[in-house]
């Protein structure tokens, strides 16, 4: 019987690129929030490691983050790297939704179960950091976190003594454009001054302020360079969304709605367009 693990995507609630670091990466600050759009990875025991994928355009060799995660976990735990993995891909990649990083994190969790190993959370986090800056977020249980450094220094977000969860309905629209993160960083202008307090802003749950103050520094260069992203953002702004933003470095844009009915109406209005969409209703 195969073991299975879901790999949920994320959105960014604000994203500030603060400075370029000596190692070539950038220091950022953002709030990451897990969503219910997810891939699924299954694993069955095998003598060697292999990967298949429902999306034939994705690599299934060592370029795939799932296999990188598998090999690094096997090395860290000193066990043979054997499993037949299958990735059922639902979340678009190259969209700023963290799907590749989430797939890697899910692979680490899944193979720890399959191989009956119990690495510490610190070991998993260290492996995750070698794969991608978003991987540590997907290895934590908290649904939302304030992220700094490369995006891998995390403080779980809480409100009124409980884990923070987005109280609004979320509609994501993804145009048919993939954006490489290094390309986006080459076009962004870092800035440290006059930044709002992202944590306080998010925890306020004040959508009337979010649309103006919850900014993403990638939005200006990405929407200028890629008309499809700008068109998706314009389409969402034509709905009753109270806040519209880019996720990560794009290409996904999202709208937040006070009422689920308004989000469902917006979803219908986007159907004629060349967009992949996903609706996450507000929690009851």
UniProtKB/Swiss-Prot annotation:
* Coiled-coil portions: none
The record's catalysed reaction(s) read: 4-CDP-2-C-methyl-D-erythritol + ATP = 4-CDP-2-C-methyl-D-erythritol 2-phosphate + ADP + H(+)
**In the record, what terms sit under GO molecular function?**
4-(cytidine 5'-diphospho)-2-C-methyl-D-erythritol kinase activity; ATP binding
Among SUPFAM superfamilies, the record links this protein to: GHMP Kinase, C-terminal domain, Ribosomal protein S5 domain 2-like
Q: Where is the active site?
A: 10, 134
Q: Which UniProt keywords apply?
A: ATP-binding, Isoprene biosynthesis, Kinase, Nucleotide-binding, Transferase
Superkingdom of source? Bacteria
What EC designation does it have?
2.7.1.148
Which BP terms from GO are recorded?
Answer: isopentenyl diphosphate biosynthetic process, methylerythritol 4-phosphate pathway; terpenoid biosynthetic process
Keyword Kinase present in the record's keywords: the answer is: yes
InterPro entries reported for this sequence: GHMP_kinase_C_dom, GHMP_kinase_C_sf, GHMP_kinase_N_dom, IspE, Ribosomal_Su5_D2-typ_SF, Ribsml_uS5_D2-typ_fold_subgr
- The UniProt annotation places ATP binding at 92-102
Record pathway: Isoprenoid biosynthesis; isopentenyl diphosphate biosynthesis via DXP pathway; isopentenyl diphosphate from 1-deoxy-D-xylulose 5-phosphate: step 3/6
Family membership noted in the UniProt record? Belongs to the GHMP kinase family. IspE subfamily.
Q: Which NCBIfam families match?
A: ispE
Q: Which PANTHER family match?
A: 4-DIPHOSPHOCYTIDYL-2-C-METHYL-D-ERYTHRITOL KINASE, CHLOROPLASTIC (PTHR43527:SF2)
Protein name per UniProt: 4-diphosphocytidyl-2-C-methyl-D-erythritol kinase
Q: Which organism is it from?
A: Salinibacter ruber (strain DSM 13855 / M31)
Q: Which classification does the entry list for the species? A: Bacteria, Pseudomonadati, Rhodothermota, Rhodothermia, Rhodothermales
């Amino acid at each position: 019987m195969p073991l299975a693990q879901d790999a949920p995507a994320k959105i960014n609630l604000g994203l500030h690129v603060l400075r370029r670091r000596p190692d070539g990466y950038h220091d950022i600050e953002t709030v990451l929030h897990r969503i219910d759009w997810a891939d699924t990875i299954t694993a069955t025991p095998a003598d060697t490691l292999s990967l298949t994928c429902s999306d034939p355009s994705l690599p299934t060799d060592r370029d795939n983050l799932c296999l990188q995660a598998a090999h690094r976990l096997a090395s860290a735990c000193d066990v043979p790297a054997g499993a037949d993995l299958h990735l059922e891909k639902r979340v678009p990649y190259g969209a700023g939704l963290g799907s590749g990083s989430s797939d890697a994190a899910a692979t680490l969790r899944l193979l720890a179960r399959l191989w009956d190993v119990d690495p510490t959370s610190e070991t998993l986090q260290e492996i995750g950091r070698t794969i991608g800056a978003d991987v540590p977020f997907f290895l934590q249980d908290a649904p939302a976190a304030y992220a700094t450094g490369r995006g891998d220094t995390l403080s779980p977000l809480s409100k009124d003594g409980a884990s923070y969860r987005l109280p609004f309905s979320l509609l994501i629209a993804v145009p048919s454009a993939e954006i490489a993160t290094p390309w986006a960083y080459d076009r962004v202008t870092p800035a440290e001054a006059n930044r709002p307090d992202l944590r306080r802003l998010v925890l306020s749950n004040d959508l009337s302020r979010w649309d103006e103050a919850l900014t993403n520094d990638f939005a200006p260069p990405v929407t200028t360079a890629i008309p499809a992203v700008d068109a998706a953002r314009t389409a969402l702004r034509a709905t009753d969304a109270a806040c519209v933003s880019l996720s990560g470095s794009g290409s996904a844009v999202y709208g937040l709605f006070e009422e689920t009915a308004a989000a469902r109406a917006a979803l219908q209005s986007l159907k004629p367009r060349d967009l992949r969409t996903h609706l996450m209703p507000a929690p009851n």
